[in-house]
């Protein structure tokens, strides 16, 4: 197996045993990007000069047996809404084209401390609004499994780069499914941690009560290793939780005999494609064969997840994105002749169609006369959705179901039909609304396109999610498929 398809765990061992140098790994990764990314289009910016310099410094430390850091010498790709000091961060928007941050996000500080090597920034839906990475101002990423298909979104670049062997790990952000859905479409592992598990300091805000940063990898153990590196409370983020237990790997190989798994009937109901249902039902049989107890339950408010999510997320976005005014930073219209024109023209020229649609929707939902009917009501529905989960978790350890109702759709197929696009979030948005952890792992393929299985856990119980996902992965995975793509 070439270096580009090696797991994080194997690379760490090879580096520790001095069988390869960090600079060899980084060189191989850039060669892979040069060869493959003109087709996949997952990267927006590369940090080649700094990456090679850092790798050479790590070579010297390796020679002295000073290999500190959980991710020593491991290459990483970062979604372009995560601030990287000195490297352009655009959120895939014309609004932030050319914006180079002068500070570091907390997750990047942590990853640098663990001696991971930043390869570059990954494509995404503009300001993380979209489910196909087609709303990016710069390019449309394709699915490595089928170049006619979307990679999912909004972290499409993060999922595609990992599946294509361009980085062994990437970070994405998940507001309503933006890590798990592209992970499902691209056949990789994607974790949305519990809200507050990972600091959001330096994540460009979309919807502050929903956003969460998480890792994408080609296997479950790698994913747990990365989450260990980025988790933890942060004084710069008042919503980060003071939870000390960040050991996700020690029990990962433990069996799941007697583990109680809930299968909500709503997750295999209307809107879920037959091929997805079949793959999930097969996965349920696999879990039973591993000793888990799977029982059907009901999460009756699932169907209200999408409407309440789109009201809440758009409302928060309309507030968060008001800072892009054409004056302090970001795109500045050259045609304006007054201050009012400058505000209007900078925003209407700098934001894309989908971002403007959501700002309109959010501003409307927050306006006087409509606030109670939309925003307040959506928050009440959010509580009902959370209560549904709380009730189920009184008797069960994890919830299982599909990640997305279908496999990846074709490029251009849904971009002009926002309601159809939003419907893809049916099974992921409730997890964000309730602030729970959720992981997507591959569980099948249909016409060559991957199908994702989602496990949802109790707050801050990522450990159990990794355990069950790891056991399932021993029975079904795509580890031999990536290299053939």
Curated annotation (Swiss-Prot):
E.C. number(s) listed in UniProt: 6.3.5.7
Keyword Transferase found: no
Keywords: ATP-binding, Ligase, Nucleotide-binding, Protein biosynthesis
A GO cellular-component term linked to this record: glutamyl-tRNA(Gln) amidotransferase complex
Superkingdom classification of source: Bacteria
InterPro entries xref list: Amidase, Amidase_CS, Amidase_dom, AS_sf, GatA
Function statement: Allows the formation of correctly charged Gln-tRNA(Gln) through the transamidation of misacylated Glu-tRNA(Gln) in organisms which lack glutaminyl-tRNA synthetase. The reaction takes place in the presence of glutamine and ATP through an activated gamma-phospho-Glu-tRNA(Gln).
Origin species: Staphylococcus aureus (strain Mu50 / ATCC 700699)
GO molecular-function terms, A-Z: ATP binding; glutaminyl-tRNA synthase (glutamine-hydrolyzing) activity
Family statement drawn from the similarity comment of this UniProt entry: Belongs to the amidase family. GatA subfamily.
PANTHER family xrefs: GLUTAMYL-TRNA(GLN) AMIDOTRANSFERASE SUBUNIT A, TRANSAMIDASE
Coiled-coil positions: none
Subunit composition and interactions: Heterotrimer of A, B and C subunits.
Annotated protein name in UniProt: Glutamyl-tRNA(Gln) amidotransferase subunit A
Catalysed transformations (reactions): L-glutamyl-tRNA(Gln) + L-glutamine + ATP + H2O = L-glutaminyl-tRNA(Gln) + L-glutamate + ADP + phosphate + H(+)
Lineage: Bacteria, Bacillati, Bacillota, Bacilli, Bacillales
Gene Ontology BP annotations: translation
Record: active site: 79, 154, 178
């Amino acid at each position: 197996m070439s270096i580009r398809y090696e797991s994080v765990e194997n690379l760490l061992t090879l580096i520790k045993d001095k069988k390869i140098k960090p600079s060899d790994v980084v060189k191989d990764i850039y060669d892979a990007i040069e060869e493959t990314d003109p087709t996949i289009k997952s990267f927006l910016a590369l940090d080649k000069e700094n990456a090679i310099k850092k790798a050479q410094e790590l070579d010297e430390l390796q020679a002295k047996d000073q290999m500190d850091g959980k991710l020593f010498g491991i290459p990483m790709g970062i979604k372009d809404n995560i601030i990287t000091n000195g490297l352009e961060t655009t959120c895939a928007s014309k609004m932030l084209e050319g914006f180079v941050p002068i500070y570091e996000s907390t997750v990047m500080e942590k990853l640098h401390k663990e001696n991971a090597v930043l390869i570059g920034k990954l494509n995404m839906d503009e300001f993380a609004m979209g489910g196909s990475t087609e709303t990016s101002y710069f390019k449309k990423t394709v699915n490595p499994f089928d170049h006619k298909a979307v990679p999912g979104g909004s972290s499409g670049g993060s999922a595609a780069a990992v599946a294509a062997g361009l980085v062994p790990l990437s970070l994405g952000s998940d507001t309503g499914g933006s890590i798990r859905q592209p992970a499902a479409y691209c056949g990789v592992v994607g974790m949305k941690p519990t809200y507050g598990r990972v600091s959001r300091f330096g994540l460009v805000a979309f919807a502050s009560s929903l956003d969460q940063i998480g890792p994408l990898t080609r296997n479950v153990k790698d994913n747990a290793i990365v989450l260990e590196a980025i988790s933890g409370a942060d004084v710069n983020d008042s919503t980060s939780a003071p939870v000390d237990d960040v050991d996700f790997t020690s029990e990962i190989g433990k069996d799941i005999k007697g583990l109680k798994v809930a299968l909500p009937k709503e997750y295999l109901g209307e809107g879920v494609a037959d091929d997805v249902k079949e793959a999930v039902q097969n996965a349920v049989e696999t879990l039973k064969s591993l000793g888990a107890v799977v029982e059907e339950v009901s999460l009756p408010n699932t169907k209200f997840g999408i409407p309440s999510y789109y009201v809440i997320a758009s409302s928060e976005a309309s507030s968060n994105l008001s800072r892009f005014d054409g004056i302090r930073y970001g795109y500045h219209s050259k045609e304006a002749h007054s201050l009012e024109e400058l505000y209007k023209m900078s925003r209407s020229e700098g934001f894309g169609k989908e971002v403007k649609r959501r700002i309109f929707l959010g501003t409307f939902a927050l306006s006087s006369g409509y606030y109670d009917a939309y925003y307040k009501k959506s928050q009440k529905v959010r509580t009902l959705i959370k209560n549904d989960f709380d009730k189920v978790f009184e008797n069960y350890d994890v919830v299982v179901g599909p990640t997305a109702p279908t496999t990846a759709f074709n490029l251009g197929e849904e971009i002009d039909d926002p309601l159809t696009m939003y419907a893809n979030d049916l099974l992921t948005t409730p997890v964000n609304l309730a602030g729970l952890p959720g992981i997507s792992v591959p569980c099948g393929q249909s016409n060559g396109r991957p199908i994702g299985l989602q496990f949802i856990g109790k707050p801050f119980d990522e450990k159990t999610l990794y355990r069950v996902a790891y056991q399932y992965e021993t029975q079904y995975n795509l580890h031999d498929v990536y290299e053939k793509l």
